Amino acid sequence: MRNSNPGTGTVRTVVHEGDGLKISHVRQPDARVLVFSFTERGNFELAGDGFGGDFLLGNGFDVVAIKSARSSWFEEVAPVLPRIHAALDQAAVRYDLRVCYGSSMGGHGAMRYAAALGANRVIAISPLFDIRDPADTRYAEDIRLLTSDPMIRADGFSPDCDYVVLYDPRGPDAPHVARFGAVVAPGRLRPVRLPYSGHPSGYFLAQTGLLKPVVEALIRGGALPKLRGPAVARRRSSVYLYCLADGCLRANKPGWAAALLDTALDRAPRDAELLALKSRALTGLRDWDGAEAAARAAMAADAGNGHRQMLLVDVLTARGALPAALAVLDKMIGEAPGVGHYAWLRQEVAARISAAAGVQPQYWAT
């Protein structure tokens, strides 16, 4: 299907649509750079011009937007690669440069298919090598959507392509980048390390105003903007402050963590992740009132999230407010009666209450 925008010279062609995958080629007059963009995980919107589409087109680049409505890590792209090549052959545009671009799941797709798409350069933000890695279970729920084939093949990388990877070297993405380094040709992997930028690092770059200039510079082959600016610039990013606070907490410095989180919450007062981490920091300081208040605020900001409810149970249990913890668990069990862990934990809390009262606990089947 072909759709032209009168007055702009932009032509949109649907290359493939089906089974939750849509691929579109967007052409503009005189464009010499083609960017294959891969949508991020959780963005199931198949309409529009894809990941970063407005930005890419606004800078004069043509786009092949690869959009997936499934968290299948773009496994469904492999069978339709011939259609992409056929569409580009039919368009008969001689591009000087082909770039693959994506973040997280999209970064994985960019790395995985760059060679097959004839890309000269990859810009991958926080790409994962394999979600089956038992040491990293962040996306284990997506494994059921995969085939038995390897997610990454060692022979799937071009020695003529530069693979630029932006990531947090202090986070769980670092081992994935190391695995990419083992299969990319020597000298072709260009890591851009962004400490305390989290996953994916694009949020940090966006919050500091660096995402667009960095991506544009990488596409055009120019020098990168300064990525390690003054502390005041980094502190504009709640992601940076969260990751730095998490690092402080892991280093047993809860006071530092709490101070950093106060700064972050000044900018995002209802951010559930920030509130939850602050509750943990205040628990480390044994500030029980503050820890409980932060946990309740996190639960209110992210209603229905069992992790937030469990945090409140943990705080109440730690401060010895066992009847209050039991009341929260009763509410959780009423909302999700099939979660066996909740019933088990309720028995444990009830047993502690009974023991404190000198009463023999009663157990029942659940």
Where are these predicted regions, by residue range?
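TPR alpha-solenoid repeat register
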Residues: 240, 274, 308, 341-342
